[in-house]
Amino acid sequence: MAERKKRSSIQTNKPNKKPMKKKPFQLNHLPGLSEDLKTMRKLRFVVNDPYATDYSSSEEEERSQRRKRYVCEIDLPFAQAATQAESESSYCQESNNNGVSKTKISACSKKVLRSKASPVVGRSSTTVSKPVGVRQRKWGKWAAEIRHPITKVRTWLGTYETLEQAADAYATKKLEFDALAAATSAASSVLSNESGSMISASGSSIDLDKKLVDSTLDQQAGESKKASFDFDFADLQIPEMGCFIDDSFIPNACELDFLLTEENNNQMLDDYCGIDDLDIIGLECDGPSELPDYDFSDVEIDLGLIGTTIDKYAFVDHIATTTPTPLNIACP
C-alpha cells in the first residue's frame, strides 16, 4: 500500500504534457514567390470523435490523452496562382537541366510500361498470328474449318502440314461460300419483287372483278325494280264470282222443303204428332234397308243353370249379382 501511494504521489508531481500542435504549411514564407502566389485560401477540417470519453486524473496520466475534436488547417493558392506556379517551376527545372525537361510519369503509366516491357513467362517471344478458321493441333498439324453462310453449320476442310496450306484452303472455300451467298440473296430479292408485283396485280384484278360484279348486280336490281313497278294492273283479268255461288257447296245435298209441304203442315202443328207420322226419305218402315234386320222378341238365353231356361230379361239381374267386374261385350 505504501508503494502504491508513493507511485501515485510521484505521478501527480509530474508536469502535464500538452500535445504539440502542428503548424499549417504556408507558402507565404517561401522565398522567391510573387505577390499573386502569396494570396492564399485556408481550408479547415474539423473532425469529431464520438467514442472519445473523459478519464480521471490518474487514468489520463497512465494512458495517452485522446481528444474528441481534431482541427486541421491547410493554406492553398487560387487556381490561377497554382497554374502559374507550376509553369514557373517547370521553367526553373528546364533552366537548371540545360534545356532538358523532365517528364513526370504517374504510377499507373509506370505499371503499364513495365507490363509491356516484361516478356510473358512460358510463351515464346515470337508469336505467330493465326488466320481465321485455322487452329493448331497438339501434335503440330494445322486444321481448317469454315461456317456455312446459309445453314450456319461448321464445315470441316481438313488437316494440313503447314499454316499456309490451311489458310489457302480456308480462303478458297470462303470465296465459294461468298459467291453462293450473293446468288441466294439476289434470287431471294428477285422472288420477293415478283411476289410483290403478283400480289399487287392480283389485288388490282380482284378489285376490278368486285367492281364489275357490283355494277352488274346494281343493274339487275334496277331492272327488276323497274319491271315490278311498270306492271299494268288494268290488264289483269278478274274472274266472276257468280259461278261459284250457283254451284252447290255440299255434294249430294238434299232439300228440306219436304218438311214444310201442305200435306204435312197440319201434322207438324199437331200436339200428338209422332215419329211414325213423318215421311223420311230413304227410311220407309215397310221397305228394305241397309241395316241388319233382327227380331229380339223370341230370344231365350240359356245360362246353364240347372238345365232350365229362364226369362229372357232375368240374366241382367243375375249378372249384376254374380260378376264383380263388367263384361266387355261388343255391340253389333
Curated annotation (Swiss-Prot):
GO terms for cellular component: nucleus. It comes from the Eukaryota. Pfam families: AP2 (PF00847). SUPFAM superfamilies: DNA-binding domain. GO terms for molecular function: DNA binding; DNA-binding transcription factor activity. Residues 1-33 are annotated as: Disordered. It is found in: Nucleus. Residues 15-24 have a biased composition (Basic residues). Keywords: Activator, DNA-binding, Ethylene signaling pathway, Nucleus, Transcription, Transcription regulation. The keyword DNA-binding applies. Residues 130-187 bind DNA. Its main location: nucleus. Transmembrane segments: none annotated. One of its GO terms (biological process) is ethylene-activated signaling pathway. Probably acts as a transcriptional activator. Binds to the GCC-box pathogenesis-related promoter element. May be involved in the regulation of gene expression by stress factors and by components of stress signal transduction pathways. Belongs to the AP2/ERF transcription factor family. ERF subfamily. This is Ethylene-responsive transcription factor ERF119. The lineage of its organism: Eukaryota, Viridiplantae, Streptophyta, Embryophyta, Tracheophyta.
